[in-house]
Amino acid sequence: MPAFHPETADQNDLTGRVAVVTGANSGLGLETARALAARGAHVVMACRNPQKAADAVAEIAANAPGGVEAMPLDLASLKSVEAFAAAFRDRFAALDLLINNAGVMVPPFGLTAEGFELQFGTNHLGHFALTARLCDRLLAAPRARVVNVASIAHRAGRIDFDTLDTPPTARTYRATAAYGQSKLANLLFTLELQRRFTAAGVAATAAAAHPGWSSTNLQANLRIAELMNPLFAQSPAQGALPTLYAALMDAAAGGYFGPDGFMEMRGKGVAPAARTARAQDVSAAERLWTHSERLTGVHFDIPARRAPAAA
């Protein structure tokens, strides 16, 4: 695959399109929002910290012909997800791009507002509920795209279905295992969402991406990053390229993309990324979907597209 440059993307002119980017106040999310705004999209930066969000809006507003704004969203609270979706639906009739980018990585033990393990609750359940609550706006767009930002850490991930209802305690919590589980969940969610879009015959599609090893504040809890980043890490702008490819290329639907270099850690371009067998398990994807609907109390409504009437 040749090196990818957003300027040559299939969907390079985003004038009139609406995009939501979660976690857009810094790192990969900020670079993704910057690139989409520069191409004419109206970008909604969905962020937890209002001041950081305002600063990010000010940083990119001068090169955002379609406009950019911030709206509050805390993915660790399903009530916040519901409030964000309601506010968005009040103002926008359609959503063209939903970039599920925000996340937490190997933090100290914590729980979401509803009592889920923090990484699974934020990285997967929060985005699952957000996508479900915005689904009708996605289906109202001519050809919407949902992009879930995953990680090479999914390779070590396993979904422990037996314990999803009973989060770990501070004593039993394993941060790295929990992160891997949440990133595997991102890929299984993408797999099942794309399957359901296809089965319904709708124009919306889903794709996934990962940034390789990129230097962002997501690594604040990784002490090894202090040593590794100067040697191996790429910039947030470079790390955002797979996300932009997944969002803007027509053929990316259903795919998973990452850097094209050594071990997918970094690269000058974008290439299809490797998925483990667990990340391609259709039955596990459907099972996770069912569990996620039950845990969040939010259900998707993807009505089948009606065939045109016979002449």
Show which residues each predicted segment covers.
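Soluble or luminal CAZymes and related metallo-dependent hydrolases
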Residues: S80, G126, A185, S235-Q238, ...
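C-terminal tail/cap regions
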Residues: P2, A252-A311
